[in-house]
Every structure is written in C-alpha cells, then in structure tokens.
Amino acid sequence: MTQSRTHTCNELRLEHVGQKVKIVGWMENVREVGNNFAFVVVRDFYGTTQVVIEDEAMMAIIKGINKESTISVEGTVRERASKNPKQATGDIEVVPEKIQVLGKCRYNELPFEINRSREADETQRLKYRYLDLRNPAVKQNIILRCNVISALRQAMTEHGFLEITTPILTASSPEGARDYLVPARKHPGKFYALPQAPQQFKQLLMTSGFDRYFQIAPCFRDEDARGDRSPGEFYQLDMEMAFADQEDVFAVLEDVLPPIFAKYGTYNIASSAPFTRIPYREAMEKYGSDKPDLRIDLIVQDMTALVQGVDFAPFAEGNLVKAVVVSDCALTRKNIDKLCADVEVQSGNKPYWFRLDENGELVGGVAKFLAERKEALIEALGLKPGCLVGIAAGKKEAAQKTAGVMRKMLGAAVPGHMDKERYEFCWIVDFPMYEIGEESGELEFCHNPFSMPSGGLEVLLKAERGEIDPLTITADQYDLVCNGVELSSGAVRNHDPEIMIKAFEMVRLGEEDVKKKFPAMYNAFCYGAPPHAGIAPGVDRMVMLLSGEESIREVIPFPMNKNAQDIMMGAPSTVEQKQLDELHIAIVGETEE
C-alpha cells in the first residue's frame, strides 16, 4: 500500500483535465443523488476536491466507509458541468478508478460536525481536539501562529539577536505567580520549578557577554484562566539587550511588530513608529486603565469638584467622581442599563449616568440630583445635546477602574467613537516603583523588583533621608499595549548590586535576603554587569489579536480548559504509588476523583 499522492486536494485545476491523479485525505462528506451516483468531498491539509461516483463498484466501496476515514483516490480529472466558484478546485472533479481506505473511522457518529465544530460545547471540542483541528477555520489559527512565530524569528535575527534556549528545570522563584514544582528524585525533599519566565537566565546571558538574546520562550505559571490568559503554559518573544536602555528596546519592537501585524492581522493597518507614550499616572487619570485602547476617542474627566455637596451618597466627600462623556449617543434606556450592569460585573463597582437631551435638560439616571449643577456641568464637561455622561464614583482605584471599563464599553457600543479596524500600539511608561500593600499596609514593590529606579541610587537615598516620598519614585519600566491588551512588561534592569540592595532595603529586605533569594544573579552582577534592558511580548496574545479571536484558547494547538485540565490527555492525573515512593512523596488529605 502506498500513500504517496500526485497532487494535494487544493491543487487540481482545468489544466489537469484528462490527467491520471492520486489524491489522499479525509472523506469529509458523501452526497448520494441517485442509484450508483454520488458526490464525495475529500479534504486534506490544503483544501478539498470533489470526487464523483458513477458506477456500482465505486458506490459499494464508498457505502462501506464512514465519514472522516482517510482514503486514497486514483482516477481521472475532468471538467465539472456545474462549477463552484467558491472552491479553489471548483472547476474540476475526479472520476475514481480506485478507492482505498488508509485509516478507518470506526464510528458512524462523530462528536460534532467537523466544519461546525466551533458551535460545539467547549468541553467536547477540547476532549476531541484532534477532530476540532480538522476544521479549516480552527486550523487556520494554528497556521497563523506558525507564520507569526516564523516572522518574529526572522525579524529578530535580522536585528542581530541570537536565539538561545534557557533551562526548563530551574529553581523556584520567590516572586510572581505560583510555581509548577518538579520533585528531584536524586535529592529527596527538594524540588525544581518550571520557569515562570527566563528572566534571570536572560539577564545572566547579558552578564556573560552576549549582546542581543531572544527566544520563543515557554513560560509556566500556576494561575487562573481568563479570556486573554491560558492556564499552565504560554509563550513569549523573550528578548534582552546589553549596553541598552528603554529607547533601544522601543526601537526594536517599533520596527519588528507593525509589519507583522499589518501582514498577518485581521486588520491591515498598524500604528507606525514612534508609538504613543503615556505615563502610568496619566493613563489611569485619562483612560482609567494602564492598558488603554487608543482606538476609542473617549477620555475620562474628573467631576469631583462639580458634584461636591450634592445629596447623593456615592458623591460623598472622600470619593472621586469620574465622567465619561459620549457625544451623539442614541442608546436606549434599556441599552444603557444593560451596559451599566456589565460594567458593574467587570469592575465590581456600580456606575451611574445621565443624559443632556435635545432641549438642553439633564434627564435619566442621576439627573435629578444634578439639576442645580446643570450649567456648571455643561461648561466643565463640554456637553452638547445628545451627550450621555457615564459616571464612576468611589475611592481612587475603584473610581478609575470603573471609569476605564465604562470608557471601553461605551466606545464599543456607540457608533463613531471607535476605529475598530486597526492595531493601535502604545507604551505605558514611568510606573511607580513602590506602593502601599493592601494587606501589609507597608511599602512594597509595585511591579518588577529588578527594574532600575529612575534617578538611580540618588533618588533612593533621598527617599531614605525623608527628602522625598518613596511613592513618587518611578521605575524605568514599561508596558506594551495594543488595542487594550497588555502584550508585555519590560524594564531597564537594575544591574548595580549597590542600587539593588538599597532598592530592597526600602521594603525591609537587606543584602542577605537578596543573596538568599537571587544568589546567581546577585553574584554575577558583582563581577561587572553591563546596563541592560528587555521585554517579552506574549506570542499567544499577539496571535489572538491578529486572528480577531476573543479567547486565547482558540490560538493554542492543545489548550487546557479554564480549570487547568487537559481533558483530552487526562491531565493532571494520579500516578502509581511506586512513582511517589521513588520521589519520597506522600499524598496527605483527600484527592480529587
């Protein structure tokens, strides 16, 4: 039995008419239209070809084959009497002389129709992912992923970066999300960890004398799933540059990403260099988010002073009150109430609203509380008849978050306020170095503890002496955002042991703590480290944006479900007692069935 083919199922055209050919693939569909007459669709990776059955012998073979069996068809190409312009091979058909089963589908019924698998329950899709991926619409996302990764590799290589792989088994990190731990058989009671990111290794590469590093890095974090985050593992374009600063990192990605987004994206327009830069505090004030979608033309305004003294509890003294003004808003009361309910679900805080009608009166929502402030509101907020004003009130963080969610939803819901068909990048810069911890009530690192503080050692010493508030210290850290999705965080690294120790002392950790938690990196920096900077855009999120998908699972070949389970492979699973004994592990407490 030979499985070689002369052509793929997307290759045959009118110029092949009269030729003897052999095609192979899955039997997608059979349509019987009379005695000993049927149309068969054969599908392979590349496309589909119609096979026409016209004799009893061939019909007998086809009737004995279940759909989704793999077959080979040898026959002659002829021109179709009735052509299908929607199909690449729609001008021809193959008249078979021999049909052979290569791999039998043993089931008469499939879990779902292959070409309609996206309509099936997600659990079924994940359980039978190998069938789901036969759907060309599903497969296309994985092909896109491959093309994007290939383009990223080529672009990074052209920019002088070396692709270097870093260890998968490493030490547990005391920072960030939960680690996936791997017991060390030869070292009872000790564990490796799967890396949450190659952070320390890539910085050590810079200290080792490499100049530009990248890899498509697998990262492992034991964290909950959400629409733009898959549990378990994810991949990122990890990069680091020696003797570099923020501007060097920006220059590389501003050159690499726009052409890839324009070529492979659902939209063929991507912002060009330089990307818009927004300081963190400005982003929170103006957009209510540190990952703003700049395709939306709405901004957040402060109306706290305008409602001071208004007899409405959410506007009470001590609360911030934020407004999102939407011009030419034709949303109905029902639409607005539904949108406000959705905002509350996402933000955890109830929003409010009012409208300026065509007669110049405040109506709807909380308008009755604001009647006496009408003129001041119109002037300060720039209101015109037809404007809807969404309101967020509460403590600073709650008010900003609610306003940000409202801005995003109103921008998408009201026509004319969102240029949807483009990719709009921006950098969020000047993140705070420190914050007051919600639980501890004390100074803590806000984001990455290894970022260089803006101003270096001098600014830390000033804070230590009480000359400045440590909460005003910013870090040389930056986020890359596209269409409201955070693609990556990056930073200029703190490569100086003296500055590093001082930064940690600000949060009540000293030199011994740093040496204990990060021994390799600290010791390496003591041997002369170059200034270096890097970033790591998420590959899965990039492909999700490019494909237009709302769930990141649609762009991963074999994703886990929301509960971090691979229901196709049955992972996680129990293991034999012998394996546990070898690892010196005892299961304590109840186990999941």
Identify the meaning behind each predicted range.
Residues 1-593:
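Class II aminoacyl-tRNA synthetase catalytic cores and aaRS-like
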